[in-house]
Amino acid sequence: MQGKAIASAGVLALAIALLPAAARPAEGPAAGAGTYEMEVLGLQTDPQSGTPLLLLRAKQDKRELTMFIGPVEANAIAIPLQGMRPPRPLTHDLLLEVIHRFRGKLKRVVITDMREGTYYANLILDAQGQEMVLDSRPSDAIALALREGAPILAAEAAFVRSPEPPAEGGKQ
């Protein structure tokens, strides 16, 4: 067990060391530039497939996005939605703690696109005064934003198509 903890700590340290190389300077949709601030309406289950659904609505014009997500991702989003605080940090809590310890902040998340039934998102971080963009699954980005109180935005491209229920083992 101790070996796993040391290995996990090593992977985390390596990820932090490589963060500046992996992140890229901010580009793409900025807040207000063809984006819409979203509110999380909640989670539901698709009656046909039994797959969890994440429901979001644009604050400006009330357009909605529905995302099929996995049960683990739904749980990660449900925890902050219900105001729960687990006794020990979960993965998203840990990631935010690491960001904060390195004097960073999650500024916003942007759902950037939907292609071939898969939504795409970016985390926009303030890394010691430099704005950085990290690619993210939308469910992870939203779970982080809800914990941080960061805005959730969606680019116009995310509204273009409607998603289909994922096939067994499908993608978000």
Question: For each predicted feature, which ranges?
Answer:
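Bacterial N-terminal signal peptides that target proteins for export
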Residues: M1-V11
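Bacterial N-terminal signal peptides
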Residues: A9-L19
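Divalent-cation
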Residues: A26-P71, N75-I142, L146-Q172
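Signal peptide cleavage region of secreted peptide precursors
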Residues: A22-A23
